[in-house]
């Protein structure tokens, strides 16, 4: 296939985290710069790209299921171009080609900005695997963003941590921070385009700047997430700032104080704790104790008493005892999270914990996950009660898909909120809403 016969329609299916979603937006922008048009239906597309996740085994198996269907279609439509990007592509590399030889391109997440160059090789008749570690270059194309109100901006790629259960450093590479100038320029453009909220993204976002040159007179890194928040805070048009995901090792009081002082920074913090037991945390190689984690949350609430806290937790880690699991339950009960993403431990290839001989049964993991989720829902419902009859600022993002007489958006604390209104008139507006009904993870109210 040559560039002149490039397929005109494309479809991207994205699995996994916000980083993957942001990568997909950038790759969509590249494809549209190349002349491709979006297709809602993958079965009518000439190029299909799966941006994959390898955090858990079920996500990986789902990818192979999708690929199997499209591989059959390619036998009937040989001009179909099949691309696998993201973390499964990085982890499996050429192994995917042996399993699905119909693939045209396998590319790791570090190569997202090189999509056009890689497709040029494909259209010249090559089957391409791009998984070698590289320095991530700035993307000069405009992402095809899924929203016209909120936007993600990557500020740091990769991860230098070596958690014993996690495959991310293997598939996303070492930390690479973007320059403050590049981040500012992207956000300035977003403000001019009418975006109201920006979420800064990174695997360990509070580690931002450690790899950039320069130190201060006091010996700290010259570029940090705290400094960046001050730098981008006053960009015209941007009304709200968020950031994710934070690592407890790098979440400082200086950062907390900045979030308190800067009015555009929303009072919502996503800080995974993974386990409430110190021995499990040590086995996970997380680099902190549950006491350290509790201290961070206490400090946040000292500066911002009403702040919303969300996190991630893993149950059924190899060797986790019932008593250790109960320490996780105790931490969740004590802190009271607004939202908690929970998962049963899933062994990932290439990670130390995957080959340990003290794996727990699926029955134990399932039981613990169910018990944790029950507590999470209870605590979230209790946390929601504080919103009842309060007036909250809601950024309207879209129409309620279940009720077209309502719009939906999020509070500064990241609570999904519904109220009656016309999306055409209200989209992108900050509206004061009196909360009349509360649920564990969402609110309903009336515009005032």
Curated annotation (Swiss-Prot):
Xref: PROSITE patterns: MTTASE_N, MTTASE_RADICAL, RADICAL_SAM, TRAM
GO cellular component: cytoplasm
Gene Ontology MF terms in the entry: 4 iron, 4 sulfur cluster binding; metal ion binding; methylthiotransferase activity
GO process annotations (BP): tRNA methylthiolation
The protein's name in its UniProt record: tRNA-2-methylthio-N(6)-dimethylallyladenosine synthase
UniProt binding sites for [4Fe-4S] cluster 2: 159, 163, 166
Residue numbers binding [4Fe-4S] cluster 1: 17, 53, 87
InterPro entries listed in its UniProt record: Elp3/MiaA/NifB-like_rSAM, Methylthiotransferase, Methylthiotransferase_CS, Methylthiotransferase_N, Methylthiotransferase_N_sf, MiaB_methiolase, rSAM, rSAM_horseshoe
Subunit structure: Monomer.
One Pfam family it belongs to: Radical_SAM
Cofactor: [4Fe-4S] cluster
Cofactor: how and how many bound: Binds 2 [4Fe-4S] clusters. One cluster is coordinated with 3 cysteines and an exchangeable S-adenosyl-L-methionine.
């Amino acid at each position: 296939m040559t560039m002149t016969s490039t397929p005109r329609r494309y479809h991207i299916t994205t699995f996994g985290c916000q980083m993957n979603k942001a990568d997909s937006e950038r790759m969509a922008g590249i494809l549209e710069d190349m002349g491709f048009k979006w297709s809602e239906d993958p079965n009518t597309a000439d190029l299909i790209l799966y941006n994959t996740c390898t955090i858990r085994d079920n996500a990986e198996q789902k990818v192979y299921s999708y690929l199997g269907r499209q591989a059959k279609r390619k036998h009937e439509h040989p001009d179909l171009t099949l691309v696998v990007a993201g973390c499964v592509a990085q982890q499996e590399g050429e192994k995917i080609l042996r399993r699905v030889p119909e693939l045209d391109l396998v590319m790791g997440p570090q190569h997202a900005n090189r999509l056009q160059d890689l497709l040029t090789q494909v259209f010249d008749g090559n089957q391409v695997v791009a998984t070698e570690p590289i320095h991530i270059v700035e993307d000069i194309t405009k992402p095809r963003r899924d929203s016209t109100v909120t936007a993600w901006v990557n500020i740091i790629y990769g991860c230098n941590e070596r958690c014993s259960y996690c495959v991310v450093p293997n598939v996303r590479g070492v930390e690479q921070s973007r320059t403050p100038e590049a981040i500012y320029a992207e956000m300035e453009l977003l403000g001019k385009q009418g975006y109201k909220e920006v979420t800064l993204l990174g695997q360990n976002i509070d580690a931002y700047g450690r790899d950039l040159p320069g130190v201060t007179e006091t010996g700290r890194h010259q570029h940090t997430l705290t400094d960046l928040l001050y730098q981008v805070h006053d960009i015209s048009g941007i009304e709200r700032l968020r950031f994710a995901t934070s690592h407890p090792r790098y979440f400082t009081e200086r950062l907390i104080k900045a979030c308190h002082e800067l009015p555009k920074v929303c009072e919502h913090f996503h800080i995974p704790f993974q386990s409430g037991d110190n021995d499990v945390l040590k086995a996970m190689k997380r680099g902190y104790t549950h006491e350290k984690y509790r201290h961070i949350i206490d400090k946040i609430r000292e500066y911002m008493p009403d702040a919303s806290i969300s996190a991630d937790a893993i149950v059924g880690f190899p060797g986790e005892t019932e008593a250790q699991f109960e320490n996780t339950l105790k931490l969740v009960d004590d802190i009271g999270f607004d939202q908690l993403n929970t998962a049963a431990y899933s062994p990932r290839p290439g990670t130390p914990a995957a080959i340990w001989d003290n794996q727990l049964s699926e029955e134990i993991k399932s039981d613990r996950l169910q018990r944790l989720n029950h507590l999470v829902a209870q605590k979230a419902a209790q946390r929601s009660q504080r919103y009842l009859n309060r007036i909250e600022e809601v950024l309207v993002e879209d129409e309620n898909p279940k009720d077209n007489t309502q719009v939906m958006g999020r509070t500064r604390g990241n609570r999904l909120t519904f109220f009656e209104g016309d999306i055409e008139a209200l989209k992108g507006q900050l509206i004061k809403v009196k909360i009349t009904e509360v649920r564990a993870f969402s609110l309903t109210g009336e515009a005032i």
